[in-house]
A protein has these predicted regions:
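HotDog/MaoC-like acyl-thioester-processing domains
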Residues: 1-6, 86-88, 92-138
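Hot-dog-fold acyl-thioester-processing enzymes
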Residues: 1-86
Length: 138
């Protein structure tokens, strides 16, 4: 089955709330070799004015992928995940993600384009706090 271009513009329900945990921040920082003390040491993060550990900027993808699972699983879109090639990713951070944050991610299919006999699917995931304030766009 090929990717259905008519799904462009579709939004999906929010993923369940995600609690940003200290150990998740530390583990991710270690995995991506982010050495800044604010990712590992609460006192260092607080000295910079943050309430707790600051997640590395790319940590937002952990949250975004939970929402993007709905896109991959959508039978109307028709994605064969075994044929997916990741081409591009951009982050816009409205504020840092900090341990203790509880956030919700909502994804939409921004576009479905033909490219070299294949389809390119562009998604946008909005991450917000529980009050609806923007945190990151992936």
């Amino acid at each position: 089955m090929s990717v259905n271009p008519d799904v462009a513009g579709r939004s999906y329900p929010p993923a369940p709330p995600f609690q940003v945990g200290r150990e998740a921040v530390r583990g991710f920082a270690e995995a991506v070799q982010a050495q800044h003390p604010a990712h590992h040491d609460v006192a260092a993060a607080r000295a910079l004015g943050h309430a707790d550990l600051v997640a590395p900027p790319t940590f937002a993808v952990v949250i975004a992928q939970r929402a993007e699972a709905a896109v991959v699983a959508d039978p109307e879109l028709g994605i064969d995940f075994s044929r997916v090639v990741h081409a591009d990713e951009r982050f816009v951070h409205h504020r840092p993600l900090v341990a203790g944050d509880e956030v919700v991610a909502t994804v939409r299919v921004e576009a479905v384009k033909s490219l070299g006999g294949n389809r390119m699917v562009t998604t946008v995931t909005e991450i917000a706090d529980l009050d609806g304030a923007a945190v990151s766009t992936v």
